[in-house]
Each structure stands twice: as C-alpha cells, then as structure tokens.
C-alpha cells in the first residue's frame, strides 16, 4: 500500500525516499556542503536589503510594482509565466512537491524544461529538497545543477530562520513555509509577499485557487491520472491542511517578531 500511487496519496513521496537508497551517501554529503557554501556566498553578495516573495494566487495577475527595488523569489509553476519572469527577473526559485516537480508526468517534465529556461535566461538560484537529489541528478544536466542548492529536512519542533548558522529546514506542507520563509529569513530583514491569497474557509474543494497564468492547466488531467492516489482527498483533508498552514504561517510571523524581521503582504490575502 505504501507505494500504491493509484490509491495512497503518500506513495509518491515514499518512492522518492526509497530512491535515496540508490545513491552514494558521500555524494549527498558533498552536495549538501556545496549547497551550504552557496547560500553563504549568496549572502555575501546581496546588495538589496529586501526581498519580494511571489506566490501563484490570482492576485498576482494584477500586481504592479517596481521589481528592481527587490530581490525576487518565486515558487513552483510560476516558472511557466514568461511575461512575469521577464518583468521580475527572479533571483530565486523554490520548489519541493513530490509529484509536480520530480515526477514522471508530462506536467513535471514541462516544469523542469521551464526551470532550464529560467536558469539560462536569468541565472536564477534554485533551492529544493535534498530528498529529491537522486532524481534531479539524473534528469538535469550538470550545467543546470550548478545553480541548485539542496536543503535537508530535519524532524524538529523549532522553525529555522537562520540556515547560515544551521543548514536545515523543518518539514511543512507548503512551499512558503517549507523553503521560501527559511531562505528569505536567512538572507533578508524585510520580506514582502504577493500572490499568497489562501482561501475562504468554506471553499474547501481544493487547497486554494491558482492564477491560470501560473498553472499548467492543460496538463492537470494527465498528472491526476498518473498520481490518482495523490488526488484522493476530501473536504476534511483540505480543511485540516489549511488550518495547519495558517498555524504554521502564524509561527513564522511570531518568529519574525523575535528576530526583527518585517513581513507584509502587498496583495489581498486570507492568510496575512
């Protein structure tokens, strides 16, 4: 059952975890050391004191700002939006989903092609999970992997807002709290957000709405077929997920208050 990807929503992540048994641990350790050094190098070269985190909610479509005032961090399928990329010229891309990014679907394949484009056009720095290194090592060419930093997850109660000091993240179920906040907190004192709309609590048929410009809508049915177990979730699941997400965001906001970080959303949000 644990690897039955047609019935079990956790099967894809289980299969990824199994893939770690087929790679040299010394290789992984070298990659982690390189990734940690890369983060410190990035920190030493930062010239702007504030960062803009961009989510894929509908509010990002009408967002108007002078991107040149910020270092820009994007996530997930925003990589498909070439017009937005041309304006924002993102410095960072974060992703870490077990099916949409390292998976065998055409959706994941198109996503990875867009990651290649992003690196070629903007030399964007990529942060993702060390969990997925064994897969990405085999699907990305070395010239692209040079822009990757792989971050390990650690089972801990505390959220880590300083990866320069301790290079790990606490596992969470959303890219904002999994990677975007940890990296942003580690490098910047002023953090502004756009496109993290969330949802009204009664709108519980899915996680939340996404901007059509930032989603591979034409490939969704294919990935739902391949990973059918992943999508066997009911309203109760989405309610619990959303409540957990709100609580996790609150914990990060609390951390900002004790670490002198400024956080604010520039677009309408049910989360902030």
Kindly label every feature range from the protein language model:
Residues 1-272:
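Metal-ion/cofactor- or nucleotide/acyl-coenzyme-handling active-site neighborhoods
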């Amino acid at each position: 059952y644990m690897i039955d990807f047609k019935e079990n929503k956790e099967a894809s992540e289980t299969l990824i975890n199994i893939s770690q048994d087929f790679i040299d641990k010394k290789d992984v350790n070298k990659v982690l050391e390189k990734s940690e050094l890369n983060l410190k190098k990035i920190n030493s070269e930062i010239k702007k004191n504030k960062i803009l985190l961009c989510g894929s909610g509908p509010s990002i479509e009408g967002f108007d700002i002078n991107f040149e005032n910020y270092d820009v961090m994007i996530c997930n399928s925003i990589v498909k939006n070439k017009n937005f990329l041309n304006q924002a010229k993102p410095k960072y891309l974060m992703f870490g989903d077990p099916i949409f990014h390292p998976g065998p679907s055409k959706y994941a394949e198109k996503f990875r092609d867009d990651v290649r484009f992003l690196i070629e056009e903007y030399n964007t720095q990529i942060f993702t999970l060390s969990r997925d290194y064994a897969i990405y090592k085999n699907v990305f060419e070395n010239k692209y992997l040079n822009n990757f930093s792989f971050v390990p997850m650690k089972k801990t109660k505390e959220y880590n807002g300083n990866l320069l000091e301790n290079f790990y993240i606490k596992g969470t179920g959303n890219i904002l709290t999994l990677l975007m906040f940890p990296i942003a907190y580690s490098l910047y004192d002023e953090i502004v957000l756009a496109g993290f709309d969330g949802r009204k609590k009664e709108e519980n048929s899915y996680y939340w709405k996404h901007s059509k410009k930032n989603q591979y809508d034409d490939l969704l049915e294919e990935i739902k077929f391949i990973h059918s177990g992943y999508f066997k979730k009911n309203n109760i699941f989405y309610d619990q997920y959303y409540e957990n997400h709100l609580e996790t965001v609150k914990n990060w906001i609390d951390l900002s208050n004790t670490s002198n970080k400024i956080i604010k959303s520039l677009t309408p949000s049910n989360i902030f």
